[in-house]
Amino acid sequence: MTKREYNSQPEMKEEVLAYLLQLSASLVLPVAIWLIAAGQIFTCLRGYTISNYQEKVEEKLCSTLVDKISEKLADLFPVYGITPSRNAPFPTILEQLLATVSQEERLAYLSNMYNSLIEMGIDSPCFYPIVQTFLFLMGGGGGPA
């Protein structure tokens, strides 16, 4: 037997929790992000297996970060004098930016973006490329960052 097999849900839960903690520590994720993702992960744990749990945890963390970055951008755009549009919602803008990032680097990219926006707001080096991508998607010139 080359892979560990789990006979019970608690063993899988421990493995998932350990991996989530490892990712959170290495990416310097805020506790709020960790708690939201953990809650979502543990509600759908039955679909997790030893062969897919890492990918599923990373996907859930990415989607949680996209949601939280979107919330932060909704607060920052008015400060910058821009009204967000339904034609270019923040998750769409973030997906456009993520298109240039490898799958392996997406979680770190989103984590860095979130932390930068939280710490520096509109002065974050991440903010201008987001605005530029927003304007591009709205047809207002510029281009994807």
Swiss-Prot record:
Domain of life, source organism: Eukaryota
GO cellular component terms given for this protein: mitochondrial membrane
Subcellular location: Mitochondrion membrane
Its membrane topology: Single-pass membrane protein
Main location as per UniProt: mitochondrion
Residues spanning the membrane: 16-36
Protein name (database record): Uncharacterized mitochondrial protein AtMg01350
Organism for this UniProt entry: Arabidopsis thaliana
Lineage, broadest ranks: Eukaryota, Viridiplantae, Streptophyta, Embryophyta, Tracheophyta
